[in-house]
């Protein structure tokens, strides 16, 4: 497999916008190639080395996906804590409720685990070491943990969390796309 640079303006190239459930800041499109002709000068790297070129940055790209998810999950946690401190039920803030405290605690554990594992992967990259296995496991585990954090944040909000009045629902949808 070889890697080719084909500009969007090239004759025969067309795209169709895809409407997504989340991640609205990043457009998704289908790309169609109808009788597109490419020149040898458009090949990136050696013939047959396309897969290796793609894989070269794959470890770092996975780190970016985990970091994005971590930031979104942290925002959901911050929102849940702020809401739990201000929402009064039965005469006191809901943050005093053991169930709410448990959700916030679970979230914090998952956030810390993900953050430290990500830092470890980035440190290994800085040392010139492969993180192929580590980042594969972290992306798998981290994406599920981040989604659980957003889910827990929705639960802290109760019924309000399932509305578009607060951003934790949007965060959940965005994380679902990772």
Regions found by a protein language model. Name each.
Residues 8-37:
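Flexible, small-/acidic-enriched active-site or ligand-binding loops
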Residues 18-22, 44-53:
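Short intrinsically disordered coil segments
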Residues 30-35, 40-41, 48-49, 55-178:
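Alpha-helical interface subdomain recognition
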Residues 1-6:
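Glycine-rich, Trp-frequent "lid" loop and neighboring beta-strands that shape
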